[in-house]
């Protein structure tokens, strides 16, 4: 099938989000992401999942506008009060990042999942992509690697409180500042490194 001219980033490069050109100054960034619980506290898991979801927009050099909650919930074994805490964690991130949660969808699922479909905007000439990376460029990490190993240790109850707190801080910290700095500095590429 022919690719529309408006599709600036699609599936060909394995990027974090799709980008669709609206006009010479605006393009829409669209992504969806969700995760299974990485921590026992529902509100913290909500914050982690929401920060993870919106990070895809930041990785493209964009700014989030709004999101839809995506929830898989075991209605037979998990109370709705816990779901409320989960969604409150997502709202915490939306408030901090300045985007609206405008709805969503919930399905009955034996394994709980939470995330968001996030829509944002980016200037068509300032999109950061995987394909934009060039040999010889410096690689800058905005967060430490290894959080997936730590979340596994948390689930096995072998991570110290200090290590767990550091991982949670990293997973819930927004990538908005790093994204703005990258765009302002003329970065040509970016990706969201996740490994839950």
What are the language-model segments listed below?
Residues 1-196:
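Helix-biased detector of long, well-ordered alpha-helical tracts
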């Amino acid at each position: 099938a022919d690719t529309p001219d408006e599709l600036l980033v699609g599936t060909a490069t394995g990027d974090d989000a799709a980008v669709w050109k609206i006009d010479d100054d605006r393009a829409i960034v669209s992504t969806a992401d969700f995760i299974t619980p990485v921590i026992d506290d529902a509100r913290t898991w909500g914050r982690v999942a929401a920060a993870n979801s919106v990070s895809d927009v930041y990785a493209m050099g964009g700014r989030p506008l709004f999101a839809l909650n995506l929830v898989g919930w075991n209605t037979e074994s998990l109370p709705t009060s816990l779901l409320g805490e989960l969604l409150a964690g997502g709202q915490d991130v939306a408030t901090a990042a300045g985007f609206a949660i405008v709805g969503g969808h919930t399905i009955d699922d034996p394994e709980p999942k939470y995330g968001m479909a996030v829509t944002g905007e980016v200037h068509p000439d300032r999109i950061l992509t995987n394909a934009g990376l060039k040999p010889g460029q410096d690689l800058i990490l905005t967060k430490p690697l290894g959080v997936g190993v730590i979340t596994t240790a948390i689930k096995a109850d072998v991570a110290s409180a200090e290590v767990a707190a550091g991982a949670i801080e990293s997973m819930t910290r927004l990538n908005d500042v790093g994204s703005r700095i990258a765009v302002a500095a003329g970065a040509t590429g970016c990706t969201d490194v996740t490994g839950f």
